[in-house]
């Protein structure tokens, strides 16, 4: 699921994003592009590699990693709903074992997770992932640009969190008085329950990590027919109504 998702292709494995950052760095240098990296390029940025122009490291594993599992699940605190990377992320204490070059240590890590998954769950599934899902998503799905980036002034980028909050489905907006019966979060639509035989699947279901939304271009150029169909089905499922 994740392998096909837009989260996987958030970084320099996305040709449109790659060209945008290459052009930005050609014009204004590497420092302003860090504004984008805090949400798009964790493997590059958090390893201190963004001082070097991305043209020189496009083919590195870090540049091709996208947003991995730990990009979301290693976050330990959400600062606010102001967006623009408003989160605190920590190096997972169990990661040294799972990423070890020693196959015995990696095997021991996997065995321990299956025997006693509690520490793994506590490390990677914080209460806010479930209880404050929209606030968690706002850390990267609410964006602005400011003078250090555009040499102009503060301007709003996209803002999916406030749009959700002001809508009827959130249970927090003025239109919520007539629908729905139960408020919906980001995950209600973008991480629907799907069947799975994963050992962690409650009642045989997990939250989909395809993150279907509006981007049909990525699965099309990636020749990923399954992901493309999932996104098309999502867009055709009466997701939006317009009040006139």
Give a label for each model feature.
Residues 3-27, 51-244:
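Primarily the internal scaffold of c-type cytochrome electron-transfer domains
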Residues 42-49:
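Conserved, well-structured interaction surfaces
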């Amino acid at each position: 699921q994740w392998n096909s998702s837009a989260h996987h292709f958030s970084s320099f494995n996305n040709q449109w994003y790659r060209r945008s950052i290459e052009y930005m760095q050609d014009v204004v240098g590497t420092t302003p592009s860090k504004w984008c990296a805090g949400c798009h390029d964790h493997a590059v940025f958090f390893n201190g590699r963004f001082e070097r122009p991305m043209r020189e490291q496009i083919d590195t594993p870090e540049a091709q990693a996208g947003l991995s599992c730990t990009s979301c699940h290693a976050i330990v605190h959400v600062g606010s709903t102001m967006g623009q990377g408003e989160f605190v992320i920590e190096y997972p204490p169990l990661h040294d074992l799972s990423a070890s070059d020693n196959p015995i240590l990696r095997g021991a890590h996997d065995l321990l997770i299956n025997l006693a998954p509690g520490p793994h769950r506590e490390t990677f599934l914080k209460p806010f992932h479930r209880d404050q899902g929209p606030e968690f998503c706002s850390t990267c799905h609410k964006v602005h640009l400011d003078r250090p980036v555009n040499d102009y002034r503060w301007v709003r980028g996209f803002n999916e969190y406030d749009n959700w909050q002001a809508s009827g489905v959130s249970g927090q907006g003025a239109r919520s008085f007539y629908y729905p019966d139960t408020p919906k979060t980001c995950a209600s639509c973008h991480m629907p329950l799907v069947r799975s035989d994963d050992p962690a699947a409650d009642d045989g279901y997990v939250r989909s990590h395809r993150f279907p939304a509006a981007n049909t271009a990525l699965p099309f150029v990636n020749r990923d027919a399954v992901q493309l169909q999932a996104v098309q089905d999502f867009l055709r499922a009466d997701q939006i109504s317009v009040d006139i």
